[in-house]
């Protein structure tokens, strides 16, 4: 779960 969120944040950043 956290990994998915981190990936999404990384995409935005």
From Swiss-Prot:
Compartments reported by the entry: Secreted
GO cellular component entries: extracellular region
Superkingdom field: Eukaryota
Signal peptide extent: none
Keywords: Amphibian defense peptide, Antibiotic, Antimicrobial, Secreted
Tagged with keyword Secreted: yes
One of the GO BP terms on file: defense response to bacterium
Tissues where the protein occurs: Expressed by the skin glands.
Role noted for this protein: Antibacterial activity against Gram-positive bacterium S.aureus (MIC=100 uM). Shows no detectable hemolytic activity towards human erythrocytes.
Similarity remark: Belongs to the frog skin active peptide (FSAP) family. Temporin subfamily.
Protein name in UniProt: Ranatuerin-6
């Amino acid at each position: 779960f956290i990994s998915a969120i981190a990936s999404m944040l990384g995409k935005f950043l």
